[in-house]
């Protein structure tokens, strides 16, 4: 049984929540997010709290309620504070630059790589080897960061490539003669 679903989600001041059946819309200073939740979940709004519970007679409804609570909590945090992912480029000649609504990457290929940013996602480059991705949708921020990382994942011998700032890449020892 999920214990996550038992904790209510607090709605801070400045955040507006609309319930329309199983569709929930959260609006705040950083943006607006909408999500359709599973039918096995019962949502109730009481003043400044959202409570989640299982629908009677549905298998794994507690698990679905816990998932729904975590998703809605991430929506509330996203529209108030936002989410950030930091990427670091390591390698000779590896560079990043913002070009309009895209991130331009030089990653040792014979051509530069341009990654278009979806709506609601912002990127900035504090230096040529750092990319900071921000947005209100946690899933989308993580997906954009993973897409950029996938162009050149860190290799295990020298650690060259695009990595998350907090990622620890295990390096292997080179072959001995």
From Swiss-Prot:
Signal peptide: none
Molecular-function GO terms, alphabetical: rRNA binding; structural constituent of ribosome
Short name of one Pfam family: Ribosomal_L6
GO biological processes: cytoplasmic translation
Record-linked InterPro entries: Ribosomal_uL6-like, Ribosomal_uL6-like_a/b-dom_sf, Ribosomal_uL6_a/b-dom, Ribosomal_uL6_bac-type, Ribosomal_uL6_CS
Record key words, sorted: Ribonucleoprotein, Ribosomal protein, RNA-binding, rRNA-binding
A cellular-component GO term for this protein: cytosolic large ribosomal subunit
Function comment: This protein binds to the 23S rRNA, and is important in its secondary structure. It is located near the subunit interface in the base of the L7/L12 stalk, and near the tRNA binding site of the peptidyltransferase center.
Quaternary structure (record): Part of the 50S ribosomal subunit.
Database matches in PANTHER family: 60S/50S RIBOSOMAL PROTEIN L6/L9, LARGE RIBOSOMAL SUBUNIT PROTEIN UL6M
Protein family (similarity comment): Belongs to the universal ribosomal protein uL6 family.
UniProt protein name: Large ribosomal subunit protein uL6
Species assigned in the record: Vibrio parahaemolyticus serotype O3:K6 (strain RIMD 2210633)
The organism's taxonomic lineage, starting at the top: Bacteria, Pseudomonadati, Pseudomonadota, Gammaproteobacteria, Vibrionales
């Amino acid at each position: 049984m999920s214990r996550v679903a038992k904790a209510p989600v607090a709605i801070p001041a400045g955040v507006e929540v609309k319930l329309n059946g199983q569709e929930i819309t959260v609006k705040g200073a950083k943006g607006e997010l909408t999500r359709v939740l599973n039918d096995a979940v019962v949502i109730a709004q009481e003043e400044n709290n959202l409570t989640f519970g299982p629908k009677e007679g549905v298998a794994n409804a507690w698990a679905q309620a816990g998932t729904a609570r975590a998703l809605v909590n991430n929506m509330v945090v996203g529209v108030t504070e936002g989410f950030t992912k930091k990427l670091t480029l390591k390698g000779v000649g590896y560079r990043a630059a913002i070009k309009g609504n895209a991130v331009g990457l030089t990653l040792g290929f014979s051509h530069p790589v341009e990654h278009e940013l979806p709506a609601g996602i912002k990127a900035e480059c504090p230096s040529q080897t750092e990319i900071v991705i921000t947005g209100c949708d946690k899933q989308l921020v993580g997906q954009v960061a993973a897409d950029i990382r996938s162009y050149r994942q860190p290799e295990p011998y020298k650690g060259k490539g695009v990595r998350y700032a907090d990622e620890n890449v295990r390096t292997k020892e080179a072959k001995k003669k």
